[in-house]
């Protein structure tokens, strides 16, 4: 709702004189405290929007492009389908644990917020630092480049698309989606809904074609489905890693908990609806691929869905590359939507500059956080070998996800009286913690160098925490304080935004952690 539509006078907000100020001054003409128009993110995400966010972020380009990663390490159709099922089951358990955490700690920010409540600011800051520096911008840059490649590739069938053209189109995609999410939250959710429907329909088309082929008697690839299976523990671990990469994104809704309507009901319900849908679609899509393609075809393919379409869709085979591009577009939108809220919450907790916790005074969108996220992604689009950076955060990703669930167990013991609308059996978080420990250990042994680089990136946040969070503001470098104050004032003027107000209703159940 825009401010001019309200019956009460429009508040006039004064610019902050200093970057460290935590309140927003209003004129006497501003609404009273009883006014419903408070300066905070609005609850605009419905159950359907939540399902679209989770499904849309989980179903990216992975299921279209990289099923061969699982098949490569399992060496048989039967075992690969088992690994896909295990990956889905593991993701369901993790999502259920996050559903309990999200309904207990009703803050946005996902694992950052949960680690903050359980273990304090330092570890939470390191989690935020890794996401800010490598995880979010790298992931979004890769998705945007994949989108651009699939859009441009049909114009260059005999060679690779021009490097500059791909990067420029990727940058345009990131900027467009950032604008959409800056404009209105509803615009972002509508884009998400639309592109989620499109990618699901594309996968249903693949599944139907595969089932038709099965009904026509093409069952030869399943007659001895486990023949040649690799039972090596290392290979199975890498196969599971490949499957879990495609399942990543099940925690998307936990990044935006504060914007969900009735989160105690809709958060676990959206997760409960989304996870079986994605797991079933993934398994059936792989069955369709394996019905038509032999193992050699899958190994040689750069995009399994495109190879499948070339052999089955005939003159309509061009639709699948478009579907992959649309899938990337929707996945990028969900990632931008979620990661901007992570930076927003980090700023609100004092771990990032205050300007990132500002929202537009009429549109109620976190414009500075969205622009910061966009800037970081554009910087990584300039890096030529950006795809190599993804190897650095597998270790840290599973470490912090697992640590969040360890925090769930810790809070069960430390705060047994906290209201928990959803309370799981301890079996689920314990199993997830054990599996997460395994997933942390695998890259340490199989990809030691990249894992150590990832640890180094995380540890680089220690001096930043000391200088920017731990030290009292008066002892921080004067130059940095002046720069932040200037940038904050300019941001307010350009983006027409102010600091948010704390939601007392959200804060009353969970005491805010401070160091």
UniProtKB/Swiss-Prot annotation:
Example GO molecular function: L-arginine transmembrane transporter activity
Induction (free text): Up-regulated by ammonia.
Residue spans, topological domain Cytoplasmic: 1-44, 100-114, 189-194, 257-266, 333-363, 407-424, 473-515
Tissue spec. comment: Expressed in cerebral cortical astrocytes.
Gene3D superfamilies: Amino acid/polyamine transporter I
Reported function: Heterodimer with SLC3A2, that functions as an antiporter which operates as an efflux routeby exporting cationic amino acids such as L-arginine from inside the cells in exchange with neutral amino acids like L-leucine, L-glutamine and isoleucine, plus sodium ions and may participate in nitric oxide synthesis. Also exchanges L-arginine with L-lysine in a sodium-independent manner. The transport mechanism is electroneutral and operates with a stoichiometry of 1: 1.
PANTHER family: AMINO ACID TRANSPORTER (PTHR11785), Y+L AMINO ACID TRANSPORTER 2 (PTHR11785:SF398)
Entry protein name: Y+L amino acid transporter 2
The organism's taxonomic lineage, starting at the top: Eukaryota, Metazoa, Chordata, Craniata, Vertebrata
Gene behind this protein: Slc7a6
